[in-house]
Amino acid sequence: MNSQRLCPVYRKWLQLHPANARAHRLSLQIQAQEAHQQGKSAFARDKCYQAFETAKVVLTALQPVSKSNITTAYNDIISFGALGMYLSSLLQRAYKKHEAHEVLQECQQLLIAVMPLHAANPSVCRLISAVQHCVDSKGLPPNTLPMPNVACH
């Protein structure tokens, strides 16, 4: 899935300013939830897509990986997984099952891709595995994606 819901220039700016991107992600998530509660499904999906893309930008932004910012890494991973599952749910309700599946698959692929970045932090690796399991149980058929080849203990 190659969604382009964010302006490429803005996406680049978010990559360079992850703290601002986190605030933007939260704002978009709130807008999506409010729109969903008000019955504005299309608007909710659009805002959720933007929040999901922003979460993806934050997760892949070059940031120092250390024991001092583990809480930030936890929040980024949980937000990404939760937004992916929420977006998938919104898409399924709109009878866009293929798109919903693609979102979950993208979640899985990105979580696998970022695992090696956190190999020095076993608790972060365990969290990534737990989020992968949640995404898996949300709707991906078994064996859709290969298991990560990085060992985290």
Which residues does each PLM region occupy?
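N-terminal alpha-helical interaction modules that lie
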Residues: 1-64, 125-153
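Structural signature of alpha-solenoid helical repeat junctions
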Residues: 23, 43, 72-79, 99, ...
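Amphipathic, well-ordered alpha-helical segments in soluble domains
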Residues: 27-28, 54, 79, 84, ...
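Conserved positions within tetratricopeptide repeat
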Residues: 45, 52, 98-105
